[in-house]
């Protein structure tokens, strides 16, 4: 079994963050481990508080795993502190881990900023160029392009063509794969996977509900799982999209505040848990 590491924030409601990552790893047949960058007090409706772990704690977590355990892929999620981002960057260089997926979490599903401005600059200009694939949503894509072009007047994305254009700007700047997540754009779940030379428009079924907390985290973790299992980048993304679709179809309903995706839902359909133990 391959080992996959999530470097991300903790979500106490377990819909997103490292909790979503661990459930995704289990559902995709890899062994999941975590390095926590921040503690968040949040639910599908709002983020109440974000508190970064100390640089000492982050360093010791990274060393505890990477010094002694072979890691086949890494998923990176929320990094709020620039100091922590710098340490993660240095650690990736030191340990030379392959198959790094970066979900540049800047804005929560509920619309709250999750990252400091100084950290955004470091991510875009340094960390982006060290990973294998970046998976921004539409708002994050626009924000990243504004930073790359140093132009605050960039229009928001309102078409697949603009998704592709902005994605190409990021891909050319980073020389890496980019997956633009366009789930909020149209009636279809249209994502665009591209690098400097290749472009793939990936369409899928869209489930219209408000129980989608954790979709981005689950997608990036599933991509990392598939890369660890030696699938190509295109196949890793396609399989991850199908996994997230199943997780949405089996989502957990919390009532008025919406709900969260259920990464284990499809597995539970095919296994009688009560007969296992």
Describe the residue ranges of each PLM region.
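Nucleotide and nucleotide-moiety/phosphate-recognizing core
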Residues: 86-94, 176, 190, 198, ...
């Amino acid at each position: 079994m391959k080992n996959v590491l999530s470097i991300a924030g903790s979500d106490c409601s377990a819909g997103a963050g490292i909790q979503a990552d661990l459930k995704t790893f289990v559902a995709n047949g890899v062994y999941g481990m975590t390095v926590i960058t921040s503690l968040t007090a949040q639910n599908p409706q709002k983020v109440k508080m974000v508190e970064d772990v100390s640089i000492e704690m982050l360093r010791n977590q990274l060393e505890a795993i990477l010094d002694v355990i072979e890691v086949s892929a890494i998923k990176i999620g929320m990094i709020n502190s620039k100091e922590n981002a710098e340490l993660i960057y240095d650690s990736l260089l030191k340990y030379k881990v392959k198959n790094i997926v970066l979900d540049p979490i800047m804005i929560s599903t509920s619309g709250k900023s999750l990252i400091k401005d100084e950290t955004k600059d470091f991510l875009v200009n340094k960390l982006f160029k060290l990973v294998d694939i970046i998976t921004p949503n539409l708002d994050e894509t626009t924000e990243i392009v504004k930073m790359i072009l140093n132009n605050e007047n960039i229009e928001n994305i309102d078409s697949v063509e603009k998704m592709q254009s902005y994605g190409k700007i990021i891909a050319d700047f980073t020389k890496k794969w980019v997956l633009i997540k366009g789930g909020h754009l149209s009636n279809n779940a249209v994502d665009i996977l591209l690098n400097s030379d290749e472009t793939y428009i990936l369409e899928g079924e869209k489930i219209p509900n408000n129980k989608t907390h954790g979709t981005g985290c689950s997608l990036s973790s599933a991509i990392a799982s598939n890369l660890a299992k030696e699938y190509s980048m295109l196949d890793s993304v396609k399989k991850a999209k199908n996994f997230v679709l199943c997780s949405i179809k089996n989502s957990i309903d919390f009532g008025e505040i919406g709900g969260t995706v259920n990464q284990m839902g499809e597995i539970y359909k095919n296994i009688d848990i009560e007969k296992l133990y």
